A protein has these predicted regions:
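Bacterial N-terminal signal peptides that target proteins for export
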Residues: 2-12
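Acidic Gly/Asp/Thr-rich repetitive segments characteristic of extracellular carbohydrate-active
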Residues: 55-92
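Sec-dependent signal peptide cleavage junction
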Residues: 21-31
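Right-handed parallel beta-helix
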Residues: 115-118, 145-156, 174-185, 198-211, ...
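Short glycine/acidic-rich loop motifs that flank beta-strands on beta-rich extracellular proteins
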Residues: 100-103, 122-127, 158-166, 187-194, ...
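N-terminal extracellular ligand-recognition/capping segment immediately after the signal peptide
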Residues: 84-128, 132-133, 154
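Short, T/G/N/S-enriched strand-turn elements that build extracellular solenoid repeat scaffolds
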Residues: 73-81, 99-108, 123, 138-139, ...
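Bacterial N-terminal signal peptides
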Residues: 12-22
Length: 287
């Protein structure tokens, strides 16, 4: 090997090392920019009045022998013409067992309150139990707003013919508060799936019961990017979740507790606080 050849090899090695070092420096993250979360969760207030309706008055069967989805939906529809930023509609579900044969849609300025001992049971094979309506078809956070779901139990009740489903789904909206709710029995989906929502509070809830082999979270935070990631919530404009507080919940007998398994390049979840939750008998990952 000539002197010129040795010199060239040494020079090439030095250049390669310099390039490698430059690459490392380019991708180093400045952790001093992290300032902590500013999450406050859902902000639902300012009502000057409220109207209360009872699902039994619309024909719901609290013994669970017949379909109550039409009756409950009629009660929820009351908010379309009667709810506003100044008037909240409280929909009461008394103690009992209510069978639903199709999904429910909830509108802006609605407080869906299930009394102690009230259980809503899914009795169909495809689709979620409840989702927010999309009255105006807006993207971003511009669809429904100010929705509260409190108390009771939502039983996914999967059957041998069930397709993967989420118990609850919410997207393109602002201010969602889920409080003191038991959500159980999911098949290959999420107990609560949330995409493109700003202002989220989930507290004092109990998530449990999962069948299937998919590695799904009980609570999934998502972006609304395409029909594979978050179907049926057009427009697909990459809206992420922002300002989420998930606290004091119980997760058990599940594969995963909470998290996200999708992302969009350059789009980030912001202001998320996860605090005081308990996880036990998890076969996969807590968070």
């Amino acid at each position: 090997m000539t002197k010129i050849t040795r010199t060239f090899i040494a020079f090439a090695a030095a250049c390669l090392l310099a390039i490698m070092l430059m690459t490392v420096r380019c991708f180093a993250y400045d952790y001093s920019t992290i300032t902590g979360t500013k999450a406050s969760g859902a902000e639902i207030s300012g009502y000057s009045g409220a109207l209360e309706v009872n699902v039994v008055d619309f024909g719901a069967d609290k013994k669970g022998k017949k379909d109550s989805s039409k009756a409950i939906q009629k009660a929820l529809d009351y908010a379309i013409d009667n709810g506003s930023n100044s008037v909240q509609i409280k929909v009461v579900v008394p103690k009992g067992k209510y069978r639903i044969d199709k999904l429910l849609e909830i509108y802006s300025n609605t407080w869906l309150y299930l009394e102690d001992g009230a259980t809503i049971v899914r009795n169909f094979d495809k689709g979620c139990m409840i989702k927010n309506a999309q009255a105006n078809g807006a993207g971003g956070y511009g669809s429904e707003r100010n929705i509260v779901i409190e108390g009771g139990c939502w039983d996914g009740n999967p059957s041998p013919t069930s397709r993967p489903f989420s118990n609850m789904r919410f997207g393109h909206m602002k201010n969602l508060w889920i409080k003191n709710v038991e959500i159980k029995n999911n098949y290959n989906g999420h107990h609560v799936e949330i995409g493109g929502v700003k202002g989220i509070t989930i507290e004092d809830c109990d998530f449990h019961g999962y069948t299937g082999t998919f590695q799904k979270e009980a609570i999934q935070l998502d972006t609304i990017s395409n029909s594979d990631v978050f179907p049926a919530y057009e427009p697909f404009d990459d809206t992420p979740c922002d300002n989420a507080v998930i606290k004091n919940n119980k997760f058990h007998d599940l594969i995963r507790g909470l998290g996200s398994h999708s992302a969009c390049l350059g789009v980030y979840y912001t202001n998320t606080l996860i605090s005081g939750n308990s996880f036990y008998n998890m076969s996969g990952t807590a968070i």
